Amino acid sequence: MGDFNLVGVIRVMPTDPEVNLDELEEKLKALIPEKYGLAKVEREPIAFGLVALKFYVLGRDEEGYSFDEIAEKFQEVEEVESAEVETVSRI
């Protein structure tokens, strides 16, 4: 997985349960800049059929890497209600 030393978990809430999660996941993956890595994407059931997507994004502890920047890009997508960085951990 390269020389990444951080993993940031970004939780994305779709606008409603009818959103196609497969399409949304692919759309969001395309927004992650190339210098980052993607370890995995998980689906987290919330309530009333709503499912959040959790992106485990790999980065480095150095200038130029910002998980908040990725969350902001995710937030600009029409089907996204919210996107926030839940945690950032060393790996």
From Swiss-Prot:
<protein>
    <recommendedName>
        <fullName>Elongation factor 1-beta</fullName>
    </recommendedName>
</protein>
<comment type="similarity">
    <text>Belongs to the EF-1-beta/EF-1-delta family.</text>
</comment>
<keyword id="KW-0251">Elongation factor</keyword>
<keyword id="KW-0648">Protein biosynthesis</keyword>
<dbReference type="Pfam" id="PF00736">
    <property type="entry name" value="EF1_GNE"/>
</dbReference>
<dbReference type="GO" id="GO:0003746">
    <property type="term" value="F:translation elongation factor activity"/>
</dbReference>
<dbReference type="InterPro" id="IPR014038">
    <property type="entry name" value="EF1B_bsu/dsu_GNE"/>
</dbReference>
<dbReference type="InterPro" id="IPR014717">
    <property type="entry name" value="Transl_elong_EF1B/ribsomal_bS6"/>
</dbReference>
<comment type="function">
    <text>Promotes the exchange of GDP for GTP in EF-1-alpha/GDP, thus allowing the regeneration of EF-1-alpha/GTP that could then be used to form the ternary complex EF-1-alpha/GTP/AAtRNA.</text>
</comment>
<dbReference type="InterPro" id="IPR036219">
    <property type="entry name" value="eEF-1beta-like_sf"/>
</dbReference>
<dbReference type="InterPro" id="IPR004542">
    <property type="entry name" value="Transl_elong_EF1B_B_arc"/>
</dbReference>
